[in-house]
């Protein structure tokens, strides 16, 4: 019998969240971001739920080949571009669009022997200082690309560092707008946070530059890009991944007794504890402290003690106080939607561990069985 733990990918939630992104940017086309194996969900598992997107944006050629193998004939964008010259041949063969963010990538294009000109997205470093040409060098890079016969069309791209924070996008937007004001080509600027928070209606003072394409990532997987200011529910998003496990043992813990490695939890009254078949080897964060929320049979309660490699412990007091029956075999929702419909947002689990929902999704371990359901 398999170990009682399972992740479920919700196709209907993916469809819903993609539609929610479109609602926020009705005049833009939508890149569905499926990098990092679709944020840990699995590209093949999310494809049906996201196939209404206008394009798929991802990181490397392997992911691009997987999307093409699923039958997708629309646009695919390599967000970091190519890493070596021979990658350009596969870009031609698979009809991929790719980002250009450095002189070396322009050099590769210039030396690439092809009869098929390629579409590129020229990246500006508008303030994040990660990838892209500085504003001072951006137009020179555009001019150089525009002179290459290997290049068909140049689109313009940047990435916001603080779309989810107090600093916002005003400064970066102004820099991008000034440098690109008379350059042709489609623009793509907005990630999940910018798409949801910084629409013309919500932020009229931002010096808004419309995106021809928006790039929702975390939002299409049902996590709030600006948690805890807003929850996923506030944004009308639904969890695309649920992680459940079952109680495999129970213990009565007396006053003064401890639970788990390091005795980090000591009971101040007698409690019943459930031992759950999930640990950090499954992708649940070891740093989640006592008090991290969980759902047991759809009733909200808390973890107690330190998370082990294969197990964690939960306080069953709230469940029994609510009149619920609980014991070995009871279902525990670590994040996502419980059988009774109650949702535990992945962000609520990530925050006590000092991380973000993105990391929990990406950290789902290969040993966890995954079911795709509508």
Swiss-Prot record:
One MF annotation (Gene Ontology) recorded for this entry: pyridoxal phosphate binding
Binding-site list for substrate: 130, 309
Enzyme category, top tier: isomerase
Domain of life: Bacteria
Keyword set, alphabetical order: Isomerase, Pyridoxal phosphate
Cofactor(s) essential for the protein: pyridoxal 5'-phosphate
Record pathway: Amino-acid biosynthesis; D-alanine biosynthesis; D-alanine from L-alanine: step 1/1
Active site: 35, 261
Name of the protein this chain belongs to: Alanine racemase
């Amino acid at each position: 019998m398999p170990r009682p733990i399972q992740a479920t990918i919700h196709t209907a939630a993916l469809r819903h969240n993609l539609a929610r992104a479109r609602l926020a940017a009705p005049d833009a086309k939508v890149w569905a971001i499926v990098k990092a194996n679709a944020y840990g969900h699995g590209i093949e598992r999310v494809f049906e739920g996201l196939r209404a997107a206008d394009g798929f944006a991802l990181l490397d050629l392997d992911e691009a080949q997987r999307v093409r193998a699923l039958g997708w004939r629309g646009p695919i964008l390599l967000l970091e571009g190519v890493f070596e010259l021979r990658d350009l041949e596969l870009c031609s063969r698979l009809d991929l669009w790719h980002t250009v963010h450095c002189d070396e990538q322009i050099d590769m294009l210039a030396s690439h022997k092809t009869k098929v000109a390629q579409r590129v997205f020229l990246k500006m470093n508008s303030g994040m200082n990660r990838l892209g040409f500085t504003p001072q060098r951006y137009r020179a890079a555009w001019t150089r690309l525009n002179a290459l016969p290997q290049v068909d069309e140049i689109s313009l791209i940047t990435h916001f560092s603080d779309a989810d924070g107090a600093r916002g996008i005003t400064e970066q937007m102004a820099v991008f707008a000034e440098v690109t004001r008379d350059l042709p080509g489609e623009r793509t600027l907005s990630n999940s946070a910018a798409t949801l928070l910084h629409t013309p209606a919500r932020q009229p003072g931002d010096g808004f530059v419309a995106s021809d394409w928006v790039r929702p990532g975390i939002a299409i997987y049902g996590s709030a890009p600006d948690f805890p200011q807003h929850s996923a529910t506030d944004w009308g998003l639904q969890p695309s991944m649920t992680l459940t496990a079952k109680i495999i043992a129970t213990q009565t813990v007396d006053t003064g007794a401890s639970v788990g490695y390091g005795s980090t939890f000591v009971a101040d009254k007698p409690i019943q504890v459930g031992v759950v078949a999930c640990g950090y080897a499954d992708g649940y964060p070891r740093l989640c402290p006592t008090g991290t929320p969980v759902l047991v049979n759809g009733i909200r309660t808390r973890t107690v003690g330190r998370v082990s490699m294969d197990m964690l412990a939960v306080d069953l007091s709230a469940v029994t106080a609510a009149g619920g029956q609980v014991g070995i075999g009871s279902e525990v929702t670590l994040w996502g939607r419980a059988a009774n419909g109650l949702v535990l947002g992945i962000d609520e689990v990530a925050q006590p561990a000092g991380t973000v929902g993105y990391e929990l999704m990406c950290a789902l371990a290969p040993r966890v069985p995954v079911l795709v359901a509508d």
